[in-house]
Amino acid sequence: MRKRLLVFTALWMLLAFTLMAFIIKLQSARMPVADILFVRCAASALVVLACQPLLGFALRSRAIGLHVRRGVCGLVAMAIWTHTLGVLPMAVSVTLNYMSPLFLGLVLLATDRSAQRPGATELACLALGFVGVVVLLNPLGAGAGPRGAIALGVLGAAMAALAFKDVRALKTAGESEWQMVFFFSLVAALGALPFTALVRLDASAGLASHAWVVLAGLLGAVGQWGVSQAFGSGDAVVAASMQYLSVVMSLGLSWLALGEAVSAQALAGMALIVAAAVLTVWQRGR
């Protein structure tokens, strides 16, 4: 029963994040990255705050430092991902974003002295993932997109791993899933605010674009709740493996709605990255 609930949560998580990525992809040509991030995160924080009496989570936290650190790392990761969504095929950007499990073992090793050192299998998976990145870059010919954007996407995955690391720590500290969603959205919105059109006073995007990004923020809140629920539960293997279905969903959605065709070589690189990440999650869960 518990595993079925995890599967259901993971399905909601990947559907929400896929639709959110699609909306951001469409609006990235109309709005600057900082504006998208602020509207998305502020909308998420305000809606969760408005529903606080119903959701029943505490507005005071005993781990505010962890929330701030997770929010800052997540903001950088989201900024990079939003940028890559605008310049890369949607499925390629989503795949690069899901490299974060490959970095998680290295992040834990660098930040937690008690963490178990990555084994040979985990290091081999990391190497396999980078082989997939090289295939995407295609140094001898035309790659799957601008090489700088692909390299930046890898950096974004590393930053996302830093944010994911704090989910378990927050869960251990007794923080609820909706507390994590609220504080993550709040910190990210405040971090993006100084770079937005509200400060520059040069807003050019229309009301419709902002409304779409608000919807993306609500979908992001649902997705973040799924992340907090699945990755904080102690049994993240099923959820983390299932989230890679969103790569397939992104491929289909971007092809049908945007006409984005991905080459056979790019598909091969994406397959290597996904296989490496799934193997990493499976190995860690044994």
Question: Would you name each region that the model predicts?
Answer:
Residues R4-M13, G56-T82, R147-G156, T196, ...:
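Loop-to-transmembrane-helix transition segments
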Residues H83, S100-A124, V248-L267:
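C-terminal transmembrane-helix exit sites in multi-pass transporters
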Residues A120-P139, Q265-R284:
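Hydrophobic transmembrane alpha-helices of multi-pass small-molecule transport proteins
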Residues A29-L46, T82-F103, P146-M159, A205-G220, ...:
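Structural signature of hydrophobic alpha-helical transmembrane segments
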Residues L5-L6, R30-V76, F103-V107, M159-A163, ...:
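Transmembrane alpha-helices of multi-pass small-molecule transport proteins
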Residues V7-L11, R62-C73, R117-F130, A149-V154, ...:
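Cytoplasmic-side transmembrane-helix entry/capping segments in multi-pass membrane proteins
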Residues F22, V48, L140-R200:
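Transmembrane alpha-helical segments that form core, pore/gating elements
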Residues S93-M99, L170, G174-V187, Q224-W255:
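Helix-helix packing/entry segments at the starts of transmembrane helices
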